[in-house]
Swiss-Prot record:
Protein name per the record: Shikimate dehydrogenase (NADP(+))
Keywords per UniProt: Amino-acid biosynthesis, Aromatic amino acid biosynthesis, NADP, Oxidoreductase
SUPFAM superfamilies in the cross-refs: Aminoacid dehydrogenase-like, N-terminal domain, NAD(P)-binding Rossmann-fold domains
Pathway: Metabolic intermediate biosynthesis; chorismate biosynthesis; chorismate from D-erythrose 4-phosphate and phosphoenolpyruvate: step 4/7
GO biological process, one term: amino acid biosynthetic process
Family assignment from sequence similarity: Belongs to the shikimate dehydrogenase family.
GO molecular function per UniProt: NADP binding; shikimate 3-dehydrogenase (NADP+) activity
Pfam families named in the record: SDH_C (PF18317), Shikimate_dh_N (PF08501)
Job description of the protein: Involved in the biosynthesis of the chorismate, which leads to the biosynthesis of aromatic amino acids. Catalyzes the reversible NADPH linked reduction of 3-dehydroshikimate (DHSA) to yield shikimate (SA).
Keyword match Oxidoreductase: yes
Disulfide links within the chain: none
Subunit structure: Homodimer.
């Protein structure tokens, strides 16, 4: 990587963020595409978020990615929001368009791009959880014209999630049904109807927890996906593979949401396959 007077910056803004592999992904992409850029990790306090966003304009940066806890907090400091960011109510990518700061959410697009030979249009999806990553996937599935989306959430969050999903359903004219994770019979019924089952919760990051009861059975044609990429095989994915269905972890989502951001910044496609091979070696 050559850094000179023409090098432009991009960064990921969050707290904590030192653990992020986004700098590895994007700096590899800059190098392989010949784009004169560098990507850093900015660990920013909440009181400094506005100044950090203003620096995008000040230093003519490509833009930034955002992670927790700033995906919603950043919105008042932006000039425009893309349709996906507006629908989800969260931003993970800011693009500097000649001094106009535009917020996008590439998580949902990245997720669906990571699925092998699968298109959600006209299909049914069951998703566990309705937090940030799950909401991005739900909204993108709605924008991609999924036939029906079944959202399972904890009883304690049910009323809040019903309201949130009603807003997405209204804006996209999609069919979204919210049910409780505690209702195992309904969960089995909706899984049986679905083409895609997604774990959108953090359950499994410890290598032990399951987001659903292990006695549930999967139909043979279903595709199973997890948003978690560490561990590489979560208990949820192992459970699915033991039932002989295709199961995909969250590493591809991480890569492809970054690829969407990279192309928005540079106008060039990220060499995703080359970078994927490096990531697989790191995390397998």
């Amino acid at each position: 990587m050559r850094i000179n007077g023409h090098t432009r910056m991009a960064a990921v803004v969050a707290k904590p963020i030192k653990h992020s592999i986004s700098p590895l992904i994007h700096n590899m992409a800059f190098e392989k595409t010949g784009v004169n850029g560098v990507y850093l990790a900015w660990e920013v306090e909440a009181k400094d978020l506005q100044a950090s966003i203003e620096n995008i304009r000040r230093y003519d940066m490509f833009g930034v990615n955002l992670s927790m806890p700033y995906k919603q907090e950043v919105i008042p400091y932006l000039d425009e929001l893309d349709v996906s960011a507006r629908l989800i109510g969260a931003v993970n990518t800011v693009v500097n368009k000649n001094g106009i700061l535009v917020g996008y959410n590439t998580d949902g697009k990245g997720f669906f791009k990571s699925l092998p030979s699968f298109a959600i249009r006209g299909k049914k999806m069951t998703i566990l959880g309705a937090g940030g990553a799950a909401t991005a996937i739900i909204a993108q599935a709605a924008l991609y014209n999924a036939e029906e989306i079944f959202v399972f959430t904890r009883q304690a969050s049910y009323e809040k999630i019903v309201s949130k999903m009603a807003a997405i359903s209204h804006q996209t004219k999609s069919r979204i049904q919210v049910l409780t994770l505690e209702d195992a019979d309904s969960l089995q019924d909706k899984i049986n109807q679905s083409d895609l089952l997604v774990n959108g919760t953090s359950l499994g990051m410890d290598g032990v927890s399951m987001p659903l009861p292990e006695q549930l059975e999967l139909p043979s044609q279903i595709l199973v996906a997890d948003v978690i990429y560490q561990p590489f095989e979560t208990p949820f994915l192992k459970w699915a593979r033991n039932q002989n269905v295709t199961a995909v972890n969250g590493l591809g989502m991480l890569l492809y949401q970054g690829a969407e951001a990279f192309e928005l910044w540079t106008g060039k496609p990220m060499p995703s396959q080359e970078i994927w091979q490096c990531l697989e070696e790191l995390y397998k």
